[in-house]
Swiss-Prot record:
<dbReference type="InterPro" id="IPR023065">
    <property type="entry name" value="Uncharacterised_ApaG"/>
</dbReference>
<feature type="domain" description="ApaG">
    <location>
        <begin position="1"/>
        <end position="125"/>
    </location>
</feature>
<dbReference type="Pfam" id="PF04379">
    <property type="entry name" value="DUF525"/>
</dbReference>
<dbReference type="InterPro" id="IPR036767">
    <property type="entry name" value="ApaG_sf"/>
</dbReference>
<protein>
    <recommendedName>
        <fullName>Protein ApaG</fullName>
    </recommendedName>
</protein>
<dbReference type="GO" id="GO:0070987">
    <property type="term" value="P:error-free translesion synthesis"/>
</dbReference>
<dbReference type="InterPro" id="IPR007474">
    <property type="entry name" value="ApaG_domain"/>
</dbReference>
């Protein structure tokens, strides 16, 4: 039996026009994350790291405990979903990073979050 933690991450992003102010170089994006435990042992998300890059190449790093104030436990076959946001000075950018996790055997491991786009639908980069 393979007890290696297996966690999948999916992200969908959207531009929030009602909270944005392009004339002030303020572009607000929401992103919805689904974290699925496809392994055979329970896991807990204990920390996060994000690298946010705007359309001019300016990078911002964000790290901290948990996500949206929680450190969720995810049972085998289970999932955890949350929504958060980012504010950029450009109408396009990217995010990527990782989650720091711990499994039921108290082993720490990292789950990579592949790069995803933050963009107004009318902008192509």
């Amino acid at each position: 039996m393979n007890d290696t933690p297996r966690v999948c991450v999916q992200v969908q992003s959207a531009y929030i026009e009602s909270q944005s102010a392009p004339e002030e170089e303020r572009y607000v994006f929401a992103y919805a994350v689904t974290i699925r435990n496809v392994g055979r042992i329970a896991v807990q998300l204990i920390g996060r790291y994000w690298l946010i890059t705007n359309g001019n190449g300016r990078e911002t790093e964000v790290q901290g405990e948990g996500v949206v104030g929680e450190q969720p436990h995810i049972e085998p076959g289970g999932e955890y979903q949350y929504t958060s946001g980012a504010v950029l000075e450009t109408p396009i950018g990217t995010m990527q990073g990782h989650y720091q996790m711990i499994d039921a055997d108290s082993e720490n491991f990292r789950v990579e979050i592949p790069v995803f786009r933050l963009a107004i639908a009318t902008h192509i980069h």
